[in-house]
Amino acid sequence: MKHRYYPILLLYFFQVACMPEEDLPIRHTGETPEYFIECYCQPGRPFALSATSVLPVSEDLQIDFSKEMKVTIHADKAISLIPGSEFIYNYGSPEKFEVRYIDSLFLDITTIDNKSITASTSIPPAVSIYNCQVAGNEAIIRFYISEKADENYYIYTAEAVHADSILNKEVCYLDYSEFQQEGLTEKSVILPDIGQAEEIIFTLKRITKANYDYQVSLNAANTANQSSITTPVPLKGNLQGALGIFTCYTEDKQTVPL
């Protein structure tokens, strides 16, 4: 008999993290228990990784972050991530991610049952917002896209903020991989509560194609789960041996006071 499995990962505990833009769907199907891994690496920031088990629906839901894993990220050297509650996720390293002479990262995990989980990711080049503006209830951002297709995946987020509270947040997943030359582009979103805001925070992330596919599938899974409890949408991650994502991104942020 087939069983349903639930990724027990409540990401609202980790709101200081920069990814993902979508909450995780609670549902997953599979024949055997699996692991769920998320790791978003950003140059200049410490490494952080979330690892948890996917348990059968017959078991009580509980926070069950595994601390029995050997986690290593290979950059210009091997960096061990250790378990602990002081990190953003449940594995981390105080060592910051510095881009020197590398263009990719590799993840190597050995679980308590000696299962191997691996993944690799490229390191996107730095991204920069050219300018941004607010016109009525529109939040408009402009930035230069790359001539290289694999560098043209982005997440644009606009937040209307009042007294340190987010009144409204809009997220766009941008695929400009079909563009063949560098050039200035713009994207606008509508923020309904913009008249009550004190400032608009513009955030632009350059992400990998794997991360783009993952975030889009995450959004689709959430949409499906809102309308159906029986038809899960698979997540398009890049891990071998587990669900989830191992990826790298770069970011730029600007604030427009109102």
Give, region by region, the residue ranges found by the protein language model.
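Sec-dependent signal peptide recognition
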Residues: K2-L9
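N-terminal leader/targeting signatures
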Residues: L9-L10, A242
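Compositionally biased amphipathic helical and low-complexity segments enriched in hydrophobic
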Residues: L10-Y12, D175
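C-terminal motif of bacterial Sec signal peptides marking the signal peptidase cleavage site
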Residues: F14-A17
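A sequence/structural signal for flexible, mid-protein segments enriched
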Residues: M19-L258
